[in-house]
Amino acid sequence: MKKVGFISLGCPKNLVDSEVMMGHLKQNGYQITADAADADTVVVNTCGFIDSAKKESIDTILEAAQLKTNGQAKRLIVAGCLVERYRDELKAEIPEVDAFIGTNQINDILAVADPKVNTRSLPVVPIGNQSATYLYDESTPRVLATPSHYAFVKIAEGCDRPCAFCFIPQMRGHFRSRRFGSIIAEAHQLAEEGVKELILVAQDSSRYGEDLGKQDALARLLRELSHVDGIEWVRVMYTYPTHISDAFLDVLAAEPKAVKYLDMPLQHASQNVLKLMKRGGNRQSLEQLIERVRRRVPGIAVRTTFISGFPGETEDDFEELMSFIKSVEFDRVGVFTYSDEEGTPAFDLSDKIQHRTATRRRNALMKEQAKISRRKNKARVGDVVRVLFEGESNESELLWQGRMETQAPDIDGCVLINDVPEGIVPAVGDLVNVKITEGHEYDLIGHISSHG
């Protein structure tokens, strides 16, 4: 049996693309392995978002190329966002690669995977992502790469936002939504496979359905998914601040299975920087938005990300962002130093910030957020919270772990469980009640008080 090794880098949206490619291959008789050294064909699905991601992608491709040079692998395929940005350069610099698949060519994996197919006969599909049409649907095969109790569901592809720092529109094409019925059908299929948590992802989730002429489509979708038998939690990631509707918030407040969690990258709070970023808004408008979110959805956890060191960011801009973080007290925050990406409007801006300054600002922001997170977590001591049980902890075989609804996998903390009543060890994916006994910077610790 032909064996394909998959290496998927980058975000959950890219992971879904990998799952689809693996699904096509498995459906056509290929064996899938996570061990590239044991494969006939190696597929590296790359990320091309920022410098660190590009470097990781290049290093991974070179490691895979060495497998081919050593005779362990017969074919090397490179896919994903890096291909959209640097296909010609990759082709020239890494001749070991047999085929390149862009983000609009996911279904072409079968045409290039077979080591018996002559490399010279492989199809060449030109890049043209402004006319990109690719969307998977409920009939598309997938091999889930996540733990069995949760799955990412891509509800849209592409982005039309003009953010000055971002190359994603050029890599992923224009914004386009999946059909409502297709997403619902896929949710039912995933529930039948034992998935308990659906995590809705897109480059711009809050715009879902606009291109289909549907109003409040995300709210309607979230409500419908919350009624799928077998699904316990539905989570929405990657929303945009100007598209947080009252209808969407009301569903979060009313539907028990719609988790009270809002992932909403804000990027900055200074009007000066937001204008340079081509995002608009100011601190006051963002504070009003957060106040509205918390008022309409009591108990909601708000997660956001910021960029430090954007060109033109002054010390006053930085101090305003710091003050904003202190004032709002987000539940989760990620801060990234600005990455100067060729081909973006920000690349041509003057007043570039030195990397050490951007790093200093990032570290200061994260240090302040750590204090906020620790204080909020300590305030939960004594609470009994609903936790999705995820099995043995990654930190110690003496601990179990799970997540509250306010914790997304991989990017947020977890609940470490140090005591399970005798005879009632839950199954992975079960919901259990955990009494919190300790609160730390990112994680909480507790014991199971009841199961079921």
Predicted regions and their residues:
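Terminal RNA-binding accessory module
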Residues: 348-452
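Generic beta-strand/beta-sheet core signal
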Residues: 7, 79, 201-203, 237-239, ...
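Conserved SAM/AdoMet-binding glycine-rich loop
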Residues: 76-80, 85, 192-316, 326
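Short glycine-enriched, charge-decorated loop/helix-capping segments at active-site entrances
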Residues: 48-49, 172-173, 212-215, 275-281, ...
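Proteins enriched for Cys/Gly/acidic motifs involved in redox and nucleic-acid/cofactor modification
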Residues: 1-208, 247, 258, 262, ...
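Conserved, mostly hydrophobic/aromatic
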Residues: 163, 183, 200, 236, ...
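Extended hydrophobic-aromatic, low-complexity segments
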Residues: 260-261, 274-275, 286, 298-301, ...
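Structural beta-strand/beta-sheet cores of well-ordered domains, especially the beta-sheet scaffolds
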Residues: 196, 232-237, 260-262, 300, ...
